[in-house]
Regions:
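Charge-dense, helix-prone N-terminal extensions
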Residues: 1-110
Length: 110
């Protein structure tokens, strides 16, 4: 996905910073990572508070196979399909990702 498309997707927050990351891109807002782009897909950050909403909307959690062959779940979820058709829906999911990033930053400072 082109950086301009990513900027548009996250415009509800304001300008985001996009950095290369592990063959994809890390998407940051005010210094906190809120999403990743990998293989053309943007995955939004979620946590124990917001993950149930992503799951209920049919989003998929990013997972990869670890060294032991067991799935390792990452704190990133696909964007629910309705968000691509409705800008208000996209704004809601983007805000949830930012809220999760803020909670993660707060927890790491403790």
């Amino acid at each position: 996905m082109e950086n301009a498309e990513i900027q548009t997707m996250f415009s509800v927050l304001g300008p985001v910073t996009i950095k290369p990351m592990f063959g994809g891109k890390g998407i940051y807002y005010q210094g906190s990572i809120i999403a990743v782009e990998f293989a053309g897909d943007v995955l939004l950050k979620a946590d124990h508070v917001s993950a149930p909403a992503f799951a209920a909307a049919g989003a998929a959690q990013w997972a990869y196979e670890g060294r032991t062959g067991k799935a390792v779940n990452m704190p990133y979820w696909s964007i629910p399909a309705d968000a691509f058709d409705e800008s208000d829906a996209m704004a809601r999911w983007v805000r949830l990702a930012y809220d999760a990033a803020l909670r993660a930053a707060k927890a790491s400072r403790k």
